[in-house]
Amino acid sequence: MARIAGIDIPSDKRVVIALTYIYGLGNKLSHKILNELKIDQNIRVKNLTEQQLSALRIEITKYNVEGDLRREVTLNIKRLMEIGAYRGLRHRKGLPVRGQKTRNNAHTVKGKPKAAIAGKKKNKVN
């Protein structure tokens, strides 16, 4: 397993697919990086030379990936909440942010239904 950007990349997969295991690198960006470095996209990670791996590491450091990207996203959301923006309020309430309706679905954001379950009624003995 090769280690790039603090992530162990699976060695039996193709390089294009393996790069997508890094948070912030999708299919399109991995294609772009490999084209810039002139590395074959169908080659397996285990067949890469040390020079190619080091070139990949250097190229990936140019992009905002993994911990830095996660931190940036959370800080952006926190900033929206602090300034009182509508999107920040939606994040705070745990509701959809991008204008979706909430009458029916939106369960992935809202979580499980919090319906009140009636307790068992006890008989009063007089």
Curated annotation (Swiss-Prot):
<comment type="subunit">
    <text>Part of the 30S ribosomal subunit. Forms a loose heterodimer with protein S19. Forms two bridges to the 50S subunit in the 70S ribosome.</text>
</comment>
<keyword id="KW-0699">rRNA-binding</keyword>
<comment type="similarity">
    <text>Belongs to the universal ribosomal protein uS13 family.</text>
</comment>
<dbReference type="GO" id="GO:0019843">
    <property type="term" value="F:rRNA binding"/>
</dbReference>
<dbReference type="InterPro" id="IPR019980">
    <property type="entry name" value="Ribosomal_uS13_bac-type"/>
</dbReference>
<dbReference type="InterPro" id="IPR001892">
    <property type="entry name" value="Ribosomal_uS13"/>
</dbReference>
<dbReference type="InterPro" id="IPR027437">
    <property type="entry name" value="Rbsml_uS13_C"/>
</dbReference>
<dbReference type="InterPro" id="IPR010979">
    <property type="entry name" value="Ribosomal_uS13-like_H2TH"/>
</dbReference>
<feature type="region of interest" description="Disordered">
    <location>
        <begin position="94"/>
        <end position="126"/>
    </location>
</feature>
<feature type="compositionally biased region" description="Basic residues">
    <location>
        <begin position="109"/>
        <end position="126"/>
    </location>
</feature>
<comment type="function">
    <text>Located at the top of the head of the 30S subunit, it contacts several helices of the 16S rRNA. In the 70S ribosome it contacts the 23S rRNA (bridge B1a) and protein L5 of the 50S subunit (bridge B1b), connecting the 2 subunits; these bridges are implicated in subunit movement. Contacts the tRNAs in the A and P-sites.</text>
</comment>
<keyword id="KW-0687">Ribonucleoprotein</keyword>
<dbReference type="GO" id="GO:0003735">
    <property type="term" value="F:structural constituent of ribosome"/>
</dbReference>
<keyword id="KW-0820">tRNA-binding</keyword>
<dbReference type="GO" id="GO:0005829">
    <property type="term" value="C:cytosol"/>
</dbReference>
<dbReference type="GO" id="GO:0006412">
    <property type="term" value="P:translation"/>
</dbReference>
<keyword id="KW-0689">Ribosomal protein</keyword>
<dbReference type="GO" id="GO:0015935">
    <property type="term" value="C:small ribosomal subunit"/>
</dbReference>
<protein>
    <recommendedName>
        <fullName>Small ribosomal subunit protein uS13</fullName>
    </recommendedName>
</protein>
<dbReference type="InterPro" id="IPR018269">
    <property type="entry name" value="Ribosomal_uS13_CS"/>
</dbReference>
<dbReference type="Pfam" id="PF00416">
    <property type="entry name" value="Ribosomal_S13"/>
</dbReference>
<dbReference type="GO" id="GO:0000049">
    <property type="term" value="F:tRNA binding"/>
</dbReference>
<keyword id="KW-0694">RNA-binding</keyword>
